[in-house]
Every structure is written in structure tokens, then in C-alpha cells.
Amino acid sequence: MVACDGEINEDAPPNGVPAHVDLFACGVQLTCPAYCIHLSIADCSSGGPETLGCAGELWLEGGSGALEVHDRPGPGNWMGDKLTLFLGDGKALVQNRTRSCLDAPCETIPWELGAHELCDVATPPATCQPDNCSELPVLENCAPLESDWSCGEVATAMSPMP
């Protein structure tokens, strides 16, 4: 695995599996609380129900921002996370990570990082109105990138324009 500083992690997967820059380690500030999905969607920090209002507003505004979704289906032998970086130009940079943990606690298993993907951000549906849009943004036409973004490139893309 390649860390954000460009150093090669010696725990990288063997067998020629390509290493990817870990966007989760880039320190991007999330625009909304991380969302956890099990039987329903909840705010990961509080465990309480989440209406997705923050994510819906981010979608409607069309600006830059970051969302993280944690997929935790039962009985607990697989975990998946998705980091979506909205670039403010109708595009989003996405990375998924997963880990299977059949014989050990999931926290002890390293993440398998997916390739960076560039997606189009779909137009919000007419049912989404300001202060009344409780949906996760929809991404379309996602395609893996030939080369990963660095954490520096992410920081530049996520910076507010002067």
C-alpha cells in the first residue's frame, strides 16, 4: 500500500496486486458525519438515526465536500467503506476499501484499497429541495483512474477557491 507521503508500506498485499494511495489517510475533513449502514443508515459517531439532510444539502449545493459511508452488514464478517470527494465541478473522486474477517476480529485485518475512480455527480431529483433533501448523492459513469491522486492533489482540489 502507498501511504500519503509516497512511502511504500511493507504490509502491502503480495502477488503483484497494485498498491493504491490511501485517500482515507489523507486527512480530508468530512463535510457531514460519517454514515453507517447496517439495517438502516445512522450517524456513526452517535449511533442515532440520520436523515441524510447534510448529504442532501451537499448534493444540492454542488460544491466541494467529502462524505464517508461505512457498510457494516451482519453478521460482521465483512466491512466496506466508501470515501467520496466532491470536487465542485460535477465530478467526484471515489475510493472504496474492504476487509473480510471470517477468523479474526475485523479491526486486526488490513484494509484492501480499491482503485481511485472518477464519477459524474448526477443531478438531484426534483424531490430534493433546499432544507428538504434526505438522500445520498447519486454517482454515475464511474471509471477507474490510470493513476492515483496524491494527498497533495486531493488537498488542492478540495481547497476553497479564492
PLM regions: where:
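Signals and flexible motifs at protein termini associated with secretion
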Residues: 1-162
